[in-house]
Amino acid sequence: MGVNLKDLIPEEAKMTIEDLRMLRGKIVVIDGYNALYQFLTAIRQPDGTPLMDSQGRITSHLSGLFYRTINILENGIKPAYVFDGKPPEIKAKEIEKRRKIREDASKKYEEALRKGDIEAARRYAMMSAKLTDEMVQDAKKLLDAMGIPWIQAPAEGEAQAAYIVSKGDAWASASQDYDSLLFGSPRLIRNLTISGKRKLPRKNVYIEIKPEIIELKKLLEKLGLTREQLIYVAILIGTDYNPDGVKGIGPKKALQLVKAYKTLDKILKIIPKTEFPIEPEKIVEYFLNPPVSTDYKLEWRAPDESKIREILVEEHDFNPERVKNAVERLVKAYREHIKSKQLGLEAWFS
């Protein structure tokens, strides 16, 4: 889920990307689990049923990964994906919370189907989506065939992506979660994999979702905080490591407290008595110094057309003609854009 910093992001620290070609030549490290989960929840039949092959295996994530990655490449962006490793022990409460939410949503989905409430069924189906190890392995195989690099993180993928960007090996990390900023990513791109028109829940209203870039340096300057103090704010609101946060404290109140008292010790003394699942100091330390791998390569290769067809058409029953056309687009994008020089937004970020 990540921490909810949305209401604290000032306009001066973010920029809407009206055209993905503005990111042409940029290397962007995408949170793989985050992206696959988005595809898994969004790409569904009207009643909430995911796309499946003839053997009943879910393919929504592969469809989203394949076509969206091609779209990203066609705009001259050089994508790489990073995947979560073993979740840290301090995340156990959040993982259990998510499991219960999925179980409850699954029951409500079945009930909605029995009642013929298609809209509710779709909503609960999305909430009950689960990303399995098999799905992740299939995604990695597809990326290999497409010639797209991926990195296996030892723990949190967002931390690994932030490390790669902070080392200068990529221009930005991409995720829906603001945790990337807490892990120190200089730039975070949101909505990269889900841009387009989306229907609002329970309303017959569609909104246009566009990618946006948040720059950590500008964010901290505008808020008047250090990165460590931003982590304090997140802890008060609630993170994946203390999902309940502090009762009665929302984003704006948390910001006020941190700016007034500045240190964690002073903040903890004045807030309502709270039982943290783990010492707040350990949460701070994890965000500042998470486990990351220094052994990674960002190398793009020519697509393996026959392997892509084998995975999508032969193994998972994708439409042969549609895959053929998409592969042609992929090959063209690789030839035209993958080696292009970084252009675009230096002026805005200088």
From Swiss-Prot:
Entry similarity comment: Belongs to the XPG/RAD2 endonuclease family. FEN1 subfamily.
Entry keyword Hydrolase: yes
Pfam families: XPG_I, XPG_N
Subunit structure and binding partners: Interacts with PCNA. PCNA stimulates the nuclease activity without altering cleavage specificity.
EC number of the protein: 3.1.-.-
Molecular functions per Gene Ontology: 5'-3' exonuclease activity; 5'-flap endonuclease activity; DNA binding; magnesium ion binding
Protein name: Flap endonuclease 1
Keywords: DNA damage, DNA repair, DNA replication, Endonuclease, Exonuclease, Hydrolase, Magnesium, Metal-binding, Nuclease
Top-rank lineage group of the source organism: Archaea
Region N-domain: start-end pairs: 1-102
CDD domains assigned: PIN_FEN1
Essential cofactor(s): Mg(2+)
